[in-house]
Amino acid sequence: MVCAGASEISMAQWASAYVESALGISKNIGDIIGPCLFAIMMGISRFFYGKYGEKLDLMKFMIASGILCLICYLLAALAPLPFLNLVGCSLCGFSVGIMWPGTISIASKKIPLGGTAMFAFLAMAGDLGGAVGPGIVGLVTQAANDNLKIGVLAGCVFPAVLVLSVLLLKRKREKV
């Protein structure tokens, strides 16, 4: 859940500044375009899973979403064209859309008697990731002479750890 929160909020929080610097547009337009495209794509992802979720394996969907998120971070950080950087930012919204609800669903199935305490712990873990993730991106950006692409590249660690965690959980589940 920490990695889900960090993956989502790191890109969402930095999207407007990233769009401004990558596309060279004004702050007002960047504040609208970056977060809006991210949010629209996130909504599409949640709508898609809400409509077709019962037909999909949640673990596989989470792994695919984490891999897509990693690709989006790489595209946002490394693509040579500003338009592709924007595509990476936007598609990241789609990739993170299932991470929080998916983590809650997996935990609910794994720990059916977890109750309120489990949901509180998951919320706290997501919030921790949402606080620490953007902070790490910001610190790396600042250390790299305000190069936001380097900061976003450092953010690749969040979806990578999420994918590894889900793979380990899936592997453990298959052994039982």
Give, region by region, the residue ranges found by the protein language model.
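Transmembrane alpha-helical cores of Major Facilitator Superfamily
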Residues: 2, 35-40, 67, 120-128
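Structural signature of the two symmetry-related core transmembrane helices
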Residues: 60-75
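Paired small-residue
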Residues: 72, 83-91
